[in-house]
Every structure is written in C-alpha cells, then in structure tokens.
Amino acid sequence: DTFDISGLRYHRIIIMTDADVDGSHIATLLMTFFFRHMKEVVEGGHIYLAKPPLYLLKATGNKKWYAYSDEEKDNMISELIEKRQSNGAKINPNDSPMKQAGLNDIQRYKGLGEMDADQLWETTMKPENRVLIQVKVEDAERADAIFSKLMGDEVSLRKSFIQTRAKDANFDELDV
C-alpha cells in the first residue's frame, strides 16, 4: 500500500509525548516513521509536536504557572521573588527559593499519564493554551539520521556516536 495525502482529513497530526528524555525518544521514532513512510505529510507541514509542561507552580489564591523546562521553572521562581520584593514583601534569605517566591507547591510531571483529564486538556490540548511545534523537513531528516545511526545495521556508527558522547553523559539524568 502507498500513502495518499489527499486522504488526510484534518491536516494536522499532533504527536503527544512526555516532556522527558523518554518522550523525546518516542517523538524521534515517530518523526522518523513519518519521514520514511509518509514524507508528504512532513513536507506539507502537517506534523506537530505538542509540548506538555514539565512543572506546575502553585501559589495561594489558585494562582498557577506552567514551566516547560528546568530553566524556565528557575526563571519563573526568580521573577516571582523579584516581583514580591518590588511589591514590598519581606523575603527571608534563609527560606527556600520556593518559599521566597510565595509558592505553596511545585509539581513535576513525570509524564502525560500523571495528569488528570482536565490538566491534560488545559495544558496540552486546549487550542488557546497548548504549545505546538511544527516539525520541519530538517527536523525529520535529523531524527532519521540519528535513528539510522543508533538503530541501524552499522555497528561502527553507533560505537562512534556513543564514544564521542559518553564523556558528556549526566548520570543523574539516567532513568535506571
């Protein structure tokens, strides 16, 4: 069977994966699949990656913010501290940054499965709030090249890839 793009109904294929490394691997596999077997969909700009948040920051009064990376979370905390200081709040430097920012809780999402249906809708699916990244041909080509290198028949490519990156491995981020 061959793929016929004229049968594409909604003109958007949205890939939803977790915000962690495992989710990135799955997205790479799916982009490679579309690039290899349904290239017209990629070339036509129909593939999107949904970007779920990694953190939920909560403060009193039902105030909440979503952060999509560790860096964004840290920046939000710093901005909240600065805002509180400029509004005259007394900040105890001995308190945790979370408390200094006036936050009650910081929740890290380990995956989409940890969100209830309302959270998933509000953060990742609701058109007004969601963050979508359109996959470009270059993205799919890069994913295909990495996939071929890591999963292909040529052991020497995989070995070289691992050897050049092993020294940069962050063992704290390994999911073991």
Positions of predicted regions on the chain:
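Conserved phosphate-chemistry cores used by DNA topoisomerases
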Residues: 1-176
